[in-house]
Amino acid sequence: DQEIVVKSMAMEKVYELACRVADSDATIFLQGETGVGKEVLARTIHNSSIRKEAPFIKVNCGAIPESIMESELFGYSKGTFTGGNKDGKKGLAQAAHNGTLFLDEIGELPLNLQAKLLQLLNEKQFTPLGEIKPVQVDVRFIAATNRNLEDMVREGTFREDLYYRLFVIPITIPSLSERREDIPFLINHFLETFNHKYKLYKTIDKEVVQFFIDYEWKGNVRELQNTIERLVLISSAQQIELSDLSDKFKKATSHTKGGISGEGLNLKQKMEQFEKQILIQTLESSNTMKEASKN
Protein backbone atom coordinates (compact mmCIF):
# COMPACT_ATOMS: atom_id res chain seq x y z
CA ASP A 1 0.00 0.00 0.00
CA GLN A 2 3.05 2.26 -0.07
CA GLU A 3 3.17 2.35 -3.87
CA ILE A 4 2.44 5.70 -5.49
CA VAL A 5 -0.13 5.60 -8.31
CA VAL A 6 0.72 7.96 -11.17
CA LYS A 7 -1.78 8.11 -14.04
CA SER A 8 -3.15 11.66 -14.12
CA MET A 9 -1.25 14.60 -15.58
CA ALA A 10 -1.37 16.33 -12.18
CA MET A 11 0.37 13.41 -10.46
CA GLU A 12 2.80 12.92 -13.35
CA LYS A 13 4.07 16.46 -12.77
CA VAL A 14 4.44 15.81 -9.04
CA TYR A 15 6.23 12.50 -9.61
CA GLU A 16 8.59 13.91 -12.27
CA LEU A 17 9.60 16.79 -9.98
CA ALA A 18 10.10 14.42 -7.03
CA CYS A 19 12.35 12.12 -9.09
CA ARG A 20 14.29 15.09 -10.48
CA VAL A 21 15.26 16.33 -7.01
CA ALA A 22 15.52 12.97 -5.24
CA ASP A 23 19.33 12.74 -5.46
CA SER A 24 19.93 16.30 -4.31
CA ASP A 25 20.34 17.26 -0.66
CA ALA A 26 17.89 20.16 -0.97
CA THR A 27 15.11 20.28 1.61
CA ILE A 28 11.75 19.24 0.16
CA PHE A 29 8.52 20.75 1.45
CA LEU A 30 5.39 18.68 0.76
CA GLN A 31 2.03 20.43 0.90
CA GLY A 32 -1.47 19.04 0.52
CA GLU A 33 -4.71 18.15 2.23
CA THR A 34 -4.97 15.38 4.81
CA GLY A 35 -4.76 11.95 3.22
CA VAL A 36 -3.29 12.90 -0.17
CA GLY A 37 -0.21 10.73 0.33
CA LYS A 38 2.54 13.02 1.62
CA GLU A 39 4.32 10.24 3.51
CA VAL A 40 4.06 7.89 0.52
CA LEU A 41 5.70 10.53 -1.69
CA ALA A 42 8.37 11.21 0.95
CA ARG A 43 9.25 7.49 1.03
CA THR A 44 9.25 7.38 -2.78
CA ILE A 45 11.75 10.26 -2.85
CA HIS A 46 13.95 8.51 -0.28
CA ASN A 47 13.80 5.19 -2.14
CA SER A 48 14.72 6.95 -5.41
CA SER A 49 17.76 8.65 -3.88
CA ILE A 50 21.36 7.64 -3.22
CA ARG A 51 20.36 7.44 0.47
CA LYS A 52 17.86 4.60 -0.10
CA GLU A 53 19.97 2.02 1.81
CA ALA A 54 20.14 4.33 4.86
CA PRO A 55 17.32 4.93 7.37
CA PHE A 56 14.09 6.77 6.60
CA ILE A 57 13.04 8.22 9.95
CA LYS A 58 9.59 9.74 10.38
CA VAL A 59 8.90 12.32 13.07
CA ASN A 60 5.20 13.04 13.55
CA CYS A 61 5.37 16.51 15.08
CA GLY A 62 1.66 16.42 15.91
CA ALA A 63 1.68 13.07 17.70
CA ILE A 64 4.63 13.47 20.08
CA PRO A 65 3.75 15.34 23.31
CA GLU A 66 5.42 18.74 23.56
CA SER A 67 6.99 17.79 26.91
CA ILE A 68 9.12 15.04 25.33
CA MET A 69 9.47 16.35 21.76
CA GLU A 70 12.97 17.78 22.28
CA SER A 71 14.34 14.59 23.85
CA GLU A 72 12.72 12.44 21.14
CA LEU A 73 14.10 14.52 18.30
CA PHE A 74 17.53 15.39 19.67
CA GLY A 75 18.15 12.76 22.35
CA TYR A 76 19.69 13.16 25.78
CA SER A 77 22.83 12.20 27.68
CA LYS A 78 23.30 9.77 30.54
CA GLY A 79 21.62 10.89 33.77
CA THR A 80 19.71 13.79 32.21
CA PHE A 81 16.26 12.58 33.30
CA THR A 82 15.01 10.77 36.37
CA GLY A 83 13.21 7.73 35.03
CA GLY A 84 14.81 8.08 31.61
CA ASN A 85 17.20 5.63 30.00
CA LYS A 86 20.16 5.43 32.39
CA ASP A 87 22.61 5.35 29.48
CA GLY A 88 20.97 8.23 27.64
CA LYS A 89 19.13 8.03 24.34
CA LYS A 90 19.97 8.75 20.74
CA GLY A 91 17.44 11.10 19.14
CA LEU A 92 15.57 10.61 15.87
CA ALA A 93 17.77 13.20 14.14
CA GLN A 94 20.85 11.11 14.91
CA ALA A 95 19.06 7.88 13.97
CA ALA A 96 18.52 9.33 10.48
CA HIS A 97 22.29 9.81 9.90
CA ASN A 98 23.14 9.22 6.21
CA GLY A 99 19.42 8.87 5.46
CA THR A 100 16.26 10.95 5.40
CA LEU A 101 14.51 12.72 8.28
CA PHE A 102 10.82 13.15 7.46
CA LEU A 103 9.23 15.91 9.55
CA ASP A 104 5.52 15.22 9.21
CA GLU A 105 2.96 17.79 10.41
CA ILE A 106 5.75 20.34 10.75
CA GLY A 107 3.19 23.04 11.52
CA GLU A 108 2.57 21.39 14.89
CA LEU A 109 6.20 21.79 16.04
CA PRO A 110 6.28 23.92 19.22
CA LEU A 111 7.65 27.42 18.71
CA ASN A 112 10.35 26.89 21.35
CA LEU A 113 11.86 24.00 19.35
CA GLN A 114 11.81 25.72 15.98
CA ALA A 115 15.10 27.56 16.62
CA LYS A 116 16.87 24.28 17.40
CA LEU A 117 15.44 22.68 14.26
CA LEU A 118 16.62 25.69 12.25
CA GLN A 119 20.16 25.10 13.54
CA LEU A 120 19.91 21.44 12.52
CA LEU A 121 18.78 22.43 9.01
CA ASN A 122 21.45 25.11 8.60
CA GLU A 123 24.46 23.46 10.21
CA LYS A 124 23.57 19.74 10.11
CA GLN A 125 24.34 19.60 13.82
CA PHE A 126 22.52 19.76 17.15
CA THR A 127 23.24 19.44 20.85
CA PRO A 128 21.46 16.63 22.76
CA LEU A 129 19.92 17.52 26.12
CA GLY A 130 22.52 17.40 28.87
CA GLU A 131 25.44 17.58 26.43
CA ILE A 132 27.85 20.41 25.63
CA LYS A 133 29.42 19.10 22.44
CA PRO A 134 27.23 19.21 19.32
CA VAL A 135 26.57 16.12 17.22
CA GLN A 136 27.20 16.32 13.48
CA VAL A 137 24.83 14.45 11.14
CA ASP A 138 24.50 13.93 7.40
CA VAL A 139 20.75 14.03 6.83
CA ARG A 140 18.35 14.87 4.02
CA PHE A 141 15.23 16.72 5.22
CA ILE A 142 11.68 16.36 3.94
CA ALA A 143 8.93 18.30 5.72
CA ALA A 144 5.17 18.03 5.23
CA THR A 145 2.05 19.86 6.35
CA ASN A 146 -1.62 20.33 5.55
CA ARG A 147 -1.59 23.74 7.22
CA ASN A 148 -0.92 27.16 5.72
CA LEU A 149 2.48 28.05 7.18
CA GLU A 150 2.37 31.55 5.65
CA ASP A 151 -0.68 32.29 7.82
CA MET A 152 1.11 30.84 10.84
CA VAL A 153 4.12 33.08 10.16
CA ARG A 154 1.80 36.13 10.08
CA GLU A 155 0.16 34.95 13.32
CA GLY A 156 3.56 34.53 14.99
CA THR A 157 3.14 30.79 15.61
CA PHE A 158 5.78 29.71 13.08
CA ARG A 159 9.23 31.24 12.60
CA GLU A 160 9.65 33.08 9.32
CA ASP A 161 13.32 32.09 8.97
CA LEU A 162 12.45 28.41 9.47
CA TYR A 163 9.65 28.69 6.92
CA TYR A 164 12.00 29.99 4.23
CA ARG A 165 14.63 27.41 5.16
CA LEU A 166 12.09 24.60 4.66
CA PHE A 167 10.59 26.12 1.52
CA VAL A 168 13.48 25.20 -0.82
CA ILE A 169 11.68 22.76 -3.13
CA PRO A 170 7.92 22.98 -2.51
CA ILE A 171 5.79 20.18 -3.95
CA THR A 172 2.00 20.42 -3.73
CA ILE A 173 0.18 17.08 -3.94
CA PRO A 174 -3.26 17.47 -5.56
CA SER A 175 -6.40 16.35 -3.77
CA LEU A 176 -8.30 13.35 -5.11
CA SER A 177 -10.95 15.68 -6.56
CA GLU A 178 -8.19 17.20 -8.72
CA ARG A 179 -7.05 13.80 -10.01
CA ARG A 180 -10.28 11.83 -10.46
CA GLU A 181 -8.86 9.94 -13.43
CA ASP A 182 -6.52 8.20 -10.94
CA ILE A 183 -9.42 6.77 -8.92
CA PRO A 184 -10.03 3.57 -10.99
CA PHE A 185 -6.32 2.75 -10.82
CA LEU A 186 -6.17 3.45 -7.08
CA ILE A 187 -9.20 1.18 -6.60
CA ASN A 188 -7.45 -1.56 -8.55
CA HIS A 189 -4.25 -1.10 -6.55
CA PHE A 190 -5.99 -1.23 -3.16
CA LEU A 191 -8.22 -4.13 -4.23
CA GLU A 192 -5.17 -6.20 -5.18
CA THR A 193 -3.39 -5.16 -1.97
CA PHE A 194 -6.21 -6.22 0.36
CA ASN A 195 -7.10 -9.35 -1.60
CA HIS A 196 -3.50 -10.44 -1.14
CA LYS A 197 -3.42 -9.39 2.53
CA TYR A 198 -6.62 -11.24 3.48
CA LYS A 199 -6.24 -14.11 0.95
CA LEU A 200 -9.50 -13.18 -0.80
CA TYR A 201 -10.55 -12.84 -4.44
CA LYS A 202 -12.99 -9.92 -4.35
CA THR A 203 -13.92 -7.98 -7.49
CA ILE A 204 -15.73 -4.66 -7.74
CA ASP A 205 -18.78 -3.75 -9.81
CA LYS A 206 -18.26 -1.05 -12.46
CA GLU A 207 -21.16 0.96 -10.99
CA VAL A 208 -19.26 1.19 -7.70
CA VAL A 209 -16.19 2.40 -9.57
CA GLN A 210 -18.18 5.19 -11.23
CA PHE A 211 -19.80 6.04 -7.90
CA PHE A 212 -16.33 6.45 -6.40
CA ILE A 213 -15.18 8.59 -9.35
CA ASP A 214 -18.10 10.97 -8.68
CA TYR A 215 -17.78 10.95 -4.89
CA GLU A 216 -16.15 13.86 -3.01
CA TRP A 217 -13.34 12.23 -1.02
CA LYS A 218 -12.76 14.64 1.86
CA GLY A 219 -10.19 12.25 3.30
CA ASN A 220 -8.58 11.83 -0.12
CA VAL A 221 -6.53 8.70 -0.95
CA ARG A 222 -6.45 7.51 2.65
CA GLU A 223 -10.26 7.54 2.86
CA LEU A 224 -10.52 5.64 -0.43
CA GLN A 225 -7.96 3.10 0.80
CA ASN A 226 -9.82 2.54 4.07
CA THR A 227 -13.13 2.25 2.19
CA ILE A 228 -11.78 -0.46 -0.15
CA GLU A 229 -10.33 -2.40 2.79
CA ARG A 230 -13.67 -2.24 4.62
CA LEU A 231 -15.62 -3.36 1.54
CA VAL A 232 -13.24 -6.25 0.87
CA LEU A 233 -13.87 -7.50 4.41
CA ILE A 234 -17.61 -6.89 4.82
CA SER A 235 -19.06 -7.71 1.39
CA SER A 236 -20.76 -11.11 1.57
CA ALA A 237 -20.50 -11.88 -2.15
CA GLN A 238 -17.34 -12.12 -4.22
CA GLN A 239 -18.23 -8.95 -6.12
CA ILE A 240 -18.54 -5.66 -4.25
CA GLU A 241 -21.87 -4.01 -5.18
CA LEU A 242 -23.50 -0.62 -4.58
CA SER A 243 -25.64 -2.28 -1.90
CA ASP A 244 -22.47 -2.90 0.13
CA LEU A 245 -21.83 0.84 0.55
CA SER A 246 -22.62 2.44 3.88
CA ASP A 247 -25.43 4.97 4.32
CA LYS A 248 -22.81 7.74 4.39
CA PHE A 249 -22.08 7.16 0.72
CA LYS A 250 -25.70 6.65 -0.29
CA LYS A 251 -26.74 9.96 1.27
CA ALA A 252 -23.72 11.94 0.05
CA THR A 253 -23.95 11.17 -3.65
CA SER A 254 -26.84 10.37 -5.96
CA HIS A 255 -25.46 7.81 -8.40
CA THR A 256 -26.54 8.19 -12.03
CA LYS A 257 -25.99 5.91 -14.99
CA GLY A 258 -25.10 6.94 -18.52
CA GLY A 259 -23.58 10.17 -19.76
CA ILE A 260 -23.10 13.40 -17.89
CA SER A 261 -24.53 16.67 -19.20
CA GLY A 262 -22.05 19.45 -19.89
CA GLU A 263 -24.70 22.16 -19.51
CA GLY A 264 -23.52 25.05 -17.37
CA LEU A 265 -19.90 23.84 -17.27
CA ASN A 266 -16.83 25.78 -18.39
CA LEU A 267 -14.35 24.32 -20.90
CA LYS A 268 -12.06 22.81 -18.25
CA GLN A 269 -14.99 21.13 -16.47
CA LYS A 270 -16.33 19.77 -19.77
CA MET A 271 -12.89 18.30 -20.56
CA GLU A 272 -12.79 16.66 -17.13
CA GLN A 273 -16.23 15.16 -17.72
CA PHE A 274 -15.14 13.91 -21.15
CA GLU A 275 -11.98 12.28 -19.72
CA LYS A 276 -14.10 10.64 -17.01
CA GLN A 277 -16.41 9.15 -19.64
CA ILE A 278 -13.43 7.74 -21.57
CA LEU A 279 -12.26 6.03 -18.37
CA ILE A 280 -15.71 4.60 -17.72
CA GLN A 281 -15.95 3.29 -21.29
CA THR A 282 -12.53 1.64 -20.89
CA LEU A 283 -13.71 -0.04 -17.70
CA GLU A 284 -16.94 -1.21 -19.30
CA SER A 285 -15.10 -2.73 -22.27
CA SER A 286 -12.65 -4.59 -20.02
CA ASN A 287 -13.24 -7.85 -18.21
CA THR A 288 -11.13 -6.97 -15.18
CA MET A 289 -9.65 -3.92 -13.48
CA LYS A 290 -6.16 -5.20 -14.34
CA GLU A 291 -7.07 -5.30 -18.02
CA ALA A 292 -8.51 -1.78 -17.79
CA SER A 293 -5.29 -0.45 -16.23
CA LYS A 294 -3.31 -1.88 -19.16
CA ASN A 295 -5.62 -0.15 -21.63
From Swiss-Prot:
Parts of the chain that traverse the membrane: none
CDD domains for the chain: AAA
Keyword Transferase assigned: no
UniProt-listed InterPro entries: AAA+_ATPase, P-loop_NTPase, Sigma_54_int, Sigma_54_int_dom_ATP-bd_1, Sigma_54_int_dom_ATP-bd_2
Domain Sigma-54 factor interaction: 4-233
Species: Pseudomonas sp. (strain NS671)
SUPFAM superfamilies, per the entry: P-loop containing nucleoside triphosphate hydrolases
Protein name: Uncharacterized protein in HyuA 5'region
SMART domains: AAA (SM00382)
Protein keywords: ATP-binding, Nucleotide-binding, Plasmid, Two-component regulatory system
GO molecular function: ATP binding; ATP hydrolysis activity
GO aspect biological process, one term: phosphorelay signal transduction system
Disulfide bonds: none
